[in-house]
């Protein structure tokens, strides 16, 4: 992944969706994007209030979040880079393309459930 091109880095930089969004869309994770709202769940800044993604820095594999910043020695504040796997998305910025992706992912999950090892009828027969 050190010399992965940008379009593959996008995929690597995915974040899990919050429990509510997971229920709503039937999708587990999504590549992160600039105006998503996220909550940090690991590391020094975890548990802080929800913040908006200010920048997605693919070269460094980090995202910068609105309120996650620190003060430099000279007094200026800078954003702290956080890896996307350490946040959960609490609100998605939806446009038509992103909706399409969600529908596509949800559809493939449905297919996966139908492809399960046992159907309900066979389970009922086994219990008899």
From Swiss-Prot:
Gene3D superfamilies: 2.30.30.30
Keyword Lyase: no
GO biological process: cytoplasmic translation; ribosomal large subunit biogenesis
Chief place where the protein resides: cytoplasm
GO molecular function terms attached to this record: RNA binding; structural constituent of ribosome
Source organism superkingdom: Eukaryota
Function: Component of the large ribosomal subunit. The ribosome is a large ribonucleoprotein complex responsible for the synthesis of proteins in the cell.
Protein name: Large ribosomal subunit protein uL24
